[in-house]
UniProtKB/Swiss-Prot annotation:
This is Serine hydroxymethyltransferase. It is found in: Cytoplasm. Pathway: One-carbon metabolism; tetrahydrofolate interconversion; Amino-acid biosynthesis; glycine biosynthesis; glycine from L-serine: step 1/1. The lineage of its organism: Bacteria, Pseudomonadati, Thermodesulfobacteriota, Desulfovibrionia, Desulfovibrionales. It comes from Nitratidesulfovibrio vulgaris (strain DSM 19637 / Miyazaki F) (Desulfovibrio vulgaris). PANTHER family: SERINE HYDROXYMETHYLTRANSFERASE. GO terms for biological process: glycine biosynthetic process from serine; tetrahydrofolate interconversion.
């Protein structure tokens, strides 16, 4: 930081302010986490200088013998974590991992059966504003209105009616366990391939806290951040039989040179995920989410599906007559960062919404446990009861900052 502040004080100031924001506030965005010093060091290393088009041992540039070591470590560790025969660690993001799979098994105009974005899916699962919705014919499934759980009978009925080439399972705002075996049975019945996007739950899958899609899905994609607690990036997992096709769709299909400094950081994070302490961490993430959800429910707030099985929960504020947008702003003023989110059967626009998504991975990384979740829940309830009370929100923010600074960002 010292050199950055000297050479470019404007950027240096932005970074310094962001460190202060992360340190003094509570990060409740379910897709965010804090990486280790070792991951940051790898990502900020001289590997950022190196072009390495191709794959280990088959590069289009010279001088790749050492970045090959890093990429091979990332591949081998990913395969060890998830028990699969193939891993591609080059996708720059989860979206590009999904694109690579789509290009490997679909033609423009083919049919995808994916989860409705407003029911918890993701943009890349067929949203009309995304490439997936523009290139392919998309049919959406959702959750049951009365329970908030995926309607597997609807999935099966839609699959029989539309005969999709690819079924996509996985979500960005679904708080319950996903039955991958049920999805595979439906896919087999209609002759479809199954892709699982486990970006949000990869850390839970890695530690056995959520059923694995490996062995059920033909293709599995994930991000490498979120619960996996690595650098921002993507990855594809599959069988070795699919290696040639998938590799060619990432490079040269949709990417050129891989980001070797990020791949090295992925390798470091995967090494951390193979340690027993990572199991302890994921168990605490789930415990914290359950406690936070329980406290919010006890305080009279509705949660989609009534609770959570994983690391996140979705508050439905419809009955409170608070918009997700206003709730997000109030929480931010109170020192807590969350994101507005659509809820199933949403009546408001995606820019306003009726929900707020909350998650526990980042708070758990800082060392917080169930007792701390009770305090966090109390502050959330207080803030949402005072959405328009600037004085009270500022007071909560001061309390939150004193509390947050007891849990350092860089403790591991």
């Amino acid at each position: 930081m010292d050199e950055l502040l000297i050479q470019d004080p404007e950027v240096g100031r932005a970074v310094t302010l962001e460190i202060e924001r992360q340190t003094g506030k509570l990060e409740l965005i379910a897709s965010e986490n804090f990486v280790s010093a070792a991951v940051r060091q790898a990502q900020g290393s001289v590997l950022t200088h190196k072009y390495a088009e191709g794959y280990p041992g088959k590069r289009y540039y010279g001088g790749c013998e050492f970045v090959d070591i890093a990429e091979n470590l990332a591949i081998d560790r990913a395969k060890a974590i998830f028990g699969c025969g193939y891993a591609n660690v080059q996708p720059h993001s989860g979206s590009q991992a999904n694109m690579g799979v789509y290009f490997a098994c679909l033609k423009p105009g083919d049919t995808i059966l994916g989860m409705n974005l407003s029911h918890g899916g993701h943009l890349t699962h067929g949203s009309p504003v995304n490439f997936s919705g523009r290139l392919y014919n998309v049919v959406f499934y959702g959750v049951k209105k009365e329970t908030g759980y995926i309607d597997y009978d609807e999935v099966a009925a839609l699959a029989r009616e539309h005969k999709p080439t690819l079924i996509v399972a996985g979500a960005s705002a679904y708080p319950r366990t996903i039955d991958f075996a049920r999805f595979r049975a439906i896919a087999d019945e209609v002759g479809a391939k199954l892709m699982v996007d486990m970006a949000h739950i990869a850390g839970l899958v890695a530690t056995g806290l959520h059923p694995t899609p490996i062995g059920q899905a033909h293709f599995t994609t994930t991000t490498t951040h979120k619960t996996l607690r690595g650098p921002r990036g993507g990855m594809i997992l599959s069988d070795e039989d699919n290696a040639k096709t998938l590799n060619s769709q990432i490079f040269p299909g949709i990417q050129g040179g891989p980001l070797m400094h990020v791949i090295a950081a992925k390798a470091v994070a995967f090494g951390e995920a193979l340690r027993p302490t990572f199991v302890d961490y994921q168990q605490q993430v789930v415990k914290n989410a359950a406690r936070l959800a329980g406290c919010l429910t006890a305080a009279g707030y509705d949660l989609v599906s009534g609770g959570t099985d994983n690391h996140l929960m979705l508050m439905d504020l419809t009955a409170k007559d608070i918009t997700g947008k206003d709730a997000e702003h109030a929480l931010d003023k109170a020192g807590m960062t969350a994101n507005k989110n659509t809820v199933p059967f949403e009546t408001r626009s995606p820019f306003v919404t009726s929900g707020v998504r909350l998650g526990t991975p980042a708070l758990t990384t800082r060392g917080m446990k169930e007792a701390e979740m009770e305090k966090v829940a109390a502050w959330i309830v207080d803030a949402l009861a005072n959405v328009n009370n600037e004085t009270r929100l500022a007071a909560i923010s001061r309390e939150v900052e004193v509390f947050a600074r007891q849990f350092p960002l860089f403790a591991w």
